[in-house]
Amino acid sequence: MATIQFIQGINEEVVPDVRLTRSRDGSTGTATFRFTNPKILDASMADKGEITGMYLMDTEGQIITRDVNAKFINGKPQAIEAVHVIKSPDDWDRFMRFMERYAQDNGLTFTKASS
């Protein structure tokens, strides 16, 4: 099972919008995750701990990014945006294996951008 966590041990239930970019040679890229009204921002989660990063967990282990930001509207957190930088072809392959598992577990589909 593939899950996403912001505090280790607490799975995020909201499925994000994920946008991918990739360099022309395919060696590097970014994955931007946007969670609208994620569970981790609920008032009931305040005593669970601090958001220390985004943890992509699956059977192979975990992928970690610390580039996590909250988006506020009228002074209240409404979304979380996290960016994972992919630095090599091996990292890209590992990330895509995670996304295939996560997509299968959560009913996501891949739509290629038109160029």
From Swiss-Prot:
Keywords: Chloroplast, Membrane, Photosynthesis, Photosystem II, Plastid, Thylakoid. The keyword Plastid applies. GO terms for biological process: photosynthesis. It holds the Pfam family Psb28. It comes from the Eukaryota. InterPro entries: Psb28_c1_sf, PSII_Psb28_class-1. Its main location: plastid. It is found in: Plastid, Chloroplast thylakoid membrane. One of its GO terms (cellular component) is chloroplast thylakoid membrane. It is a peripheral membrane protein. Gene3D superfamilies: Photosystem II Psb28. Part of the photosystem II complex. Belongs to the Psb28 family. This is Photosystem II reaction center Psb28 protein. It comes from Pyropia yezoensis (Susabi-nori). The lineage of its organism: Eukaryota, Rhodophyta, Bangiophyceae, Bangiales, Bangiaceae. The gene is psb28.
